[in-house]
């Protein structure tokens, strides 16, 4: 029984870590094309850049940037043109500020 609980814990504990994001240089290899807006009110998602990949998260905008695309949960491409983006981001200073403003786009990062 303890073994089963341990296995379940290992499987589901990964769901609570910050999202590992890889920034691609080509739009065609990205899962999501994003644009960074200048004002918070323009954003679909407010993102906090975590320094810790094990920071609790449930698709709430806490991102940890990785150097390898194979360890990433999602690959994003930062575009310079807002009209090309499927998701508009605003980077926040504090973790508690992170979160979705347009929840209809949450599926993009699952």
Language model segments and positions:
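Repetitive, compositionally biased segments used for assembly/scaffolding
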Residues: 17-110
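Bacterial Sec-dependent N-terminal signal peptides
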Residues: 1-21
């Amino acid at each position: 029984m303890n073994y089963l609980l341990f296995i379940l814990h290992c499987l589901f504990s990964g769901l609570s870590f910050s999202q590992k994001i890889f920034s691609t240089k080509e739009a065609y290899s990205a899962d999501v094309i994003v644009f960074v807006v200048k004002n918070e009110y323009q954003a679909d998602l407010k993102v906090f850049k975590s320094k810790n990949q094990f920071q609790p998260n449930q698709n709430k905008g806490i991102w940890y940037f990785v150097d390898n695309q194979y360890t990433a949960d999602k690959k994003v491409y930062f575009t310079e043109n807002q009209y090309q983006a499927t998701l508009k981001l605003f980077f926040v200073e504090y973790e508690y500020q992170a979160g979705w403003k347009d929840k209809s786009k949450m599926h993009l990062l699952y």
